[in-house]
Amino acid sequence: MSNEIMQENTPFVECSAFHRGMSVLEASLRNTEDSDAIISGLLKGAAEFYGASRASVVEADWDLGIGVITYEWCKDGVSAQRDMLQCLPMEKFPRWRKALRANKPVVISDLQRLEKVYPDEAAFFREYGVTTLLAAPFSKRINQGFIAVDDPTRYTDD
């Protein structure tokens, strides 16, 4: 396949890139039993696939009404924010709570447009320098939350 075709952003190219990324990820984690290393590897894989510099796991604590960043992967040279973001009040993120209950992703593609509808959420992301975001929900037994990718640069149309 020519380089020109592979540079296009077609469903075939996206699927092929995803398959390659999953193969590399599976090979690197195949013999790992350390759950922290596995989660870090998955976050790194997600960030690299989407061309992002940071990916994290945000878990919901329904009893306390907060979101907690439990894992974070950052590209070299990017400052970690996990320790600063331990008790995210759910009332500032009503859209996220609704999306999680409906098992739907959260997408931020335009921070200015978001500010008109969800000003607290937009202010939060602006404060931390995030301008776009993709977040996919997960639910496993008692844990629920999102795997989030900050400022993705590739495959953002899906």
Model-derived segments and their meaning:
Residues 131-139:
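A short, aliphatic-rich beta-strand micro-motif
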Residues 1-37, 48-49:
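Signal-transmission linkers at sensory-effector interfaces
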Residues 63, 138-144, 152:
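Flexible loop/coil segments at beta-strand boundaries within sensory signal-transduction domains
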Residues 47, 56-98, 104:
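GAF sensory/regulatory domain recognition
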